[in-house]
Amino acid sequence: MKKASRSVGSVPKVSAISKTQTAEKIKPENSSSASTGGKLVKPGTAASLSKTKSSDDLLAGMAGGVTVTNGVKGKKSTCPSAAPSASAPAMTTVENKSKISTGTASSTKRNTSTGNKESSSTRERLRERTRLNQSKKLPSAGQGANDMALAKRSRSRTATECDVRMSKSKSDNQISDRAALEAKVKDLLTLAKTKDVEILHLRNELRDMRAQLGINEDHSEGDEKSEKETIMAHQPTDVESTLLQLQEQNTAIREELNQLKNENRMLKDRLNALGFSLEQRLDNSEKLFGYQSLSPEITPGNQSDGGGTLTSSVEGSAPGSVEDLLSQDENTLMDHQHSNSMDNLDSECSEVYQPLTSSDDALDAPSSSESEGIPSIERSRKGSSGNASEVSVACLTERIHQMEENQHSTSEELQATLQELADLQQITQELNSENERLGEEKVILMESLCQQSDKLEHFSRQIEYFRSLLDEHHISYVIDEDVKSGRYMELEQRYMDLAENARFEREQLLGVQQHLSNTLKMAEQDNKEAQEMIGALKERSHHMERIIESEQKGKAALAATLEEYKATVASDQIEMNRLKAQLENEKQKVAELYSIHNSGDKSDIQDLLESVRLDKEKAETLASSLQEDLAHTRNDANRLQDAIAKVEDEYRAFQEEAKKQIEDLNMTLEKLRSDLDEKETERSDMKETIFELEDEVEQHRAVKLHDNLIISDLENTVKKLQDQKHDMEREIKTLHRRLREESAEWRQFQADLQTAVVIANDIKSEAQEEIGDLKRRLHEAQEKNEKLTKELEEIKSRKQEEERGRVYNYMNAVERDLAALRQGMGLSRRSSTSSEPTPTVKTLIKSFDSASQVPNPAAAAIPRTPLSPSPMKTPPAAAVSPMQRHSISGPISTSKPLTALSDKRPNYGEIPVQEHLLRTSSASRPASLPRGPAMESAKTLSVSRRSSEEMKRDISAQEGASPASLMAMGTTSPQLSLSSSPTASVTPTTRSRIREERKDPLSALAREYGGSKRNALLKWCQKKTEGYQNIDITNFSSSWNDGLAFCALLHTYLPAHIPYQELNSQDKRRNFMLAFQAAESVGIKSTLDINEMVRTERPDWQNVMLYVTAIYKYFET
């Protein structure tokens, strides 16, 4: 703490002051006191504190230093030789505390371990020098000044390295959460208290050392020059050693500066990579605050009080970037390298010193040139220290809070994206199953279409039959247009069948062509492989023949060698026999010599025996050598015979194997040749087939070109119908918009709805009775149909004009009633399977409103325009007010009794069937046909099994009709079946989009805004709450924790329920209660707990998003 809170007066020194001090203090400052601070400045000294030099460490250190050292300013630190040894436990405590800090790099740990070793060795040297100086008992005023300079240097080195570590610590601690920071602050507060105790202890020790050394504490700075001269008088012999030590220190400091420059560059690159910059500046208020704390006066006392003065200020030093200060320090050392004064080092190290504020202040401080000539007064430094620390803490807290918000928003967005991906996977699976189901239904519809086509042909044949009967009875008729349209329908159906068959045959022929081409390619590839195999086999056969020839040559050479060896053995045998005979002769001679010796002169015999003995030995040695040669020759002959036998066996085996391989290769070659011939014949046949298929394909292309012209006409008709459908959808959207705009008025009539339940029950019973009556009328109509069919056969001979008009009008009316009943029964079945299976207040009031409009029969016959609303899209009565019901009762009344349908029965000539059979042969309703609201329900039929079953039931009912009824229904039944077709309402894309929007209301919002659903809903909320005060929606957690966002969002729709101008962010419970009550008043159920929302600062974003989605779904879909 003593190093961290040094005086500011020694920091903002200018170069002129440094040079003046150098001139004044060069001799007295180079006293023997330099031996006490020999190599105090080491990288490890600052590295041992590097783990705890984050922004919170420096703030705590600064606060602790200011509170303790105000009482000792202005005093001269004469003997701080015990300070390094006393600061060693402090550094140990810092190291122990730093073990719990997070985000420290591995390089800092290595520097810390190195710094511990160096600091321990430095402490040992300082203790020895302190003992030597105490034994001499010399005046130590200069020694105190020298120690002061060393302490300043150590502090400046610590501060410089702290700044470097600070930026690194900031980049490492950016991602730490709030709980870790709070724990770290508590630990640093404990550390500050410990440092306060250590400072008090060190101050006591300093006083004791001054008392022991006899230094007068009341010396003024004016007596400094006389004290230095006295010190020079007492210590003339220590100057040279001090100069050498200072030179060594200069060299070491220069090396350390280079090392710190490299580290600074690395940290700057790292900060730039993280998005920060060392060229950032404080804002205007912080600059003004920093300038007010400066003063244009610098006293010599403020320049000389060193480690003992601990009244440092945050804004009083010369601020600047770390690299600029390091470069200044290096330049100062190069300029004053030969000055050899302690004060020179003091001024240089004070320039290096940085204000020990947070890492943000170190990065945002202005350059040193802005405040280089502005010194400060002690009082202004004391006053500005606490304020600057508060500003730094506030700035750091705000940045930490902003980082936390960004981190939570990012994590929230990632979770929402993952959840949407899972939903998309599920939707994909559902769409696949839906596609399969639609495929099955398509097959059913195709079968039904085929049956309808058969029925159409059957009906056309019956019409021809009835027409022939009319011709026989000489009854005139004018239905040429109908006949033409029927024939055209038949021709068009046949054309569709022919086009489908042609397309199918073309695809089949193309498949056959592709198959044949693939087969041809495979045959060519097999032929190529066979040729390659034949070549390889031939090459192998030639190789085998060459091996056989080489083996035969080797065998002949071995045979020649064997003959030579045999001749050698025979000659050796002859030589051996000759030697044996010679040996026998010699033995006889020896025997004769023995006999002569026994009988004659022994001396001559002795010589002769000696000569004979020598000849015998020579002969024996020659015989033994010959025998050895013979044995070797025999062994060689035996070995060669064995080798020859082995080679002969191998040669025979190889010859047999080669013969077998040659036979196999010949067989394979024959087989491949036969296969190749077959492939060639197949290839020629395939080419001929391909040529024929190409001709057929050209013919089919010409037919298809002709077909496409007709199909284009049909597609134009389909596009017109789609335009009509889009117009109707826009009209439906306008009705929904009106319903939302007038929903506020409906809330005033909710009390009246309670009294209408009894009336609704009565209406329901009346409706049930009416349904029974309609069923009874249906049965009677069917009986009348049978009776009229019999009467038709009886009155064929009456007048043609009267009978024709009456029969056609009546049968048309009956068919209209039957179609209306079918549609009404289908509508009742759909309503029974809707989202509200049980009768509720809304459905009862809806039936009551519709029943109240029964006396107006004219509305039932109004033909619907393309912009008129669909009956199934009519809003429920519970969602509109009585005034709205009266205003829109005309165009959207849906449940009028079916008896009104019989009042408006159009004539047969008014139905333009031929036009729609001409334009909409595939799946379109007759647009110009007048129909009632019950007929319009066919538009909303979806493709389902129920529709196919109804089709089959209608077909079976039509099969059982009499021939007379078929004549009347022959031209209208295709129209009815086509108008009730499930595919006549909307396209599959529109249906799937409607289903998707009903299932997930955020899909349309995501398509509108782009991006994910979460981001789209967030943009929608921002757009709706734009212009509201105190509203900043950036996520779904902390942006909604005060309830104002909910109130603003609902205020856009329900301004009468929420007095937004009276709300404030402090009363959270009231805000949430108002918002939830307003939402519940329109039917939005609250899924959030008020107590939990009030208690937590960051609620669960998924629950909040679900509730906001419910609000969007209610008001926007």
From Swiss-Prot:
SMART domains found in the cross-reference section: CH
UniProt-listed Pfam families: CH
Skewed-composition ranges (Low complexity): 45-90, 358-377, 971-990
Chief location category: cytoplasm
Composition bias, Basic and acidic residues: 120-131, 158-171, 946-956
Residue stretches of biased makeup (Polar residues): 93-117, 293-303
Calponin-homology (CH) domain: residues covered: 1011-1116
A GO biological process held by the record: cell division
Region (Disordered), start-end ranges: 1-176, 293-323, 358-390, 919-1001
Sequence positions bearing Phosphoserine: S384, S385, S389, S868, S881, S887
InterPro entries: CH_dom (IPR001715), CH_dom_sf (IPR036872), F-actin_Monoox_Mical (IPR050540)
Coiled coil: 168-280, 394-449, 487-807
Keywords: Cell cycle, Cell division, Cell junction, Coiled coil, Cytoplasm, Cytoskeleton, Gap junction, Phosphoprotein
SUPFAM superfamilies the record matches: Calponin-homology domain, CH-domain
Subcellular location: Cytoplasm, Cytoskeleton; Cytoplasm, Cytoskeleton, Spindle; Cell junction, Gap junction
Keyword Cell division belongs to the record: yes
Domain of life: Eukaryota
GO cellular component: cytoplasm; filamentous actin; gap junction; microtubule organizing center; spindle
UniProt KW Phosphoprotein keyword: yes
Function: Involved in cytokinesis and spindle organization. May play a role in actin cytoskeleton organization and microtubule stabilization and hence required for proper cell adhesion and migration.
Assembly and interaction partners: May interact with both microtubules and actin cytoskeleton.
Protein family: Belongs to the cytospin-A family.
Annotated protein name in UniProt: Cytospin-A
Gene source species: Pan troglodytes
